[in-house]
Amino acid sequence: MRIEVIKREENVLEFYLEGEDHTFANLLNEVLHENEHVTFAGYTIEHPVLMARKPKFRVVTDGKITPEQVLEEAAQKIFDRARAVLEAWKEVLGE
């Protein structure tokens, strides 16, 4: 995964999420929408064949926190949820 910033303003961030597809992009988008300071979050895949693994995101906040802060919080939430799934599986497997 690599992030390529396209546009950065005080409360707007546009970037490509290289190496990912709808699977991770949709998860990130859903978690971004959970943040009360996000006024818009969405992504597109500009060409389904040529850019299938390069979603383009746009994140807009209310200005109380930056889009970068929102993304950091979202990444931590995704990490925490993945850890919870791992722990639940370990419990089921008796590990």
From Swiss-Prot:
Which Pfam families does its entry note? RNA_pol_L_2
SUPFAM superfamilies reported in the protein's UniProt record: RBP11-like subunits of RNA polymerase
Q: Where in the cell is it found?
A: Cytoplasm
* Family membership noted in the UniProt record: Belongs to the archaeal Rpo11/eukaryotic RPB11/RPC19 RNA polymerase subunit family.
Q: Quaternary state and partners of this protein?
A: Part of the RNA polymerase complex.
Q: What is its EC class?
A: transferase
Supply the EC number(s): 2.7.7.6
**Annotated keywords:** Cytoplasm, DNA-directed RNA polymerase, Nucleotidyltransferase, Transcription, Transferase
| UniProt GO MF annotations | DNA binding; DNA-directed RNA polymerase activity; protein dimerization activity
GO cellular component, as recorded: cytoplasm; DNA-directed RNA polymerase complex
Q: Does the keyword Protease apply?
A: no
Q: Which NCBIfam families match?
A: PRK01146.1-3
Q: InterPro entries from the xrefs? A: RBP11-like (IPR036603), RBP11-like_dimer (IPR009025), RNA_pol_Rpb11_13-16kDa_CS (IPR008193), Rpo11-like (IPR022905)
Q: What CDD domains would the database entry show?
A: RNAP_L (cd06927)
Which purpose does this protein serve, as stated in its record?
DNA-dependent RNA polymerase (RNAP) catalyzes the transcription of DNA into RNA using the four ribonucleoside triphosphates as substrates.
Protein's recorded name: DNA-directed RNA polymerase subunit Rpo11
The biological process GO terms on file are: DNA-templated transcription
User: Does the UniProt entry include the keyword Heme?
Assistant: no
Catalysis: reaction(s)? RNA(n) + a ribonucleoside 5'-triphosphate = RNA(n+1) + diphosphate
Q: Which gene encodes it?
A: rpo11
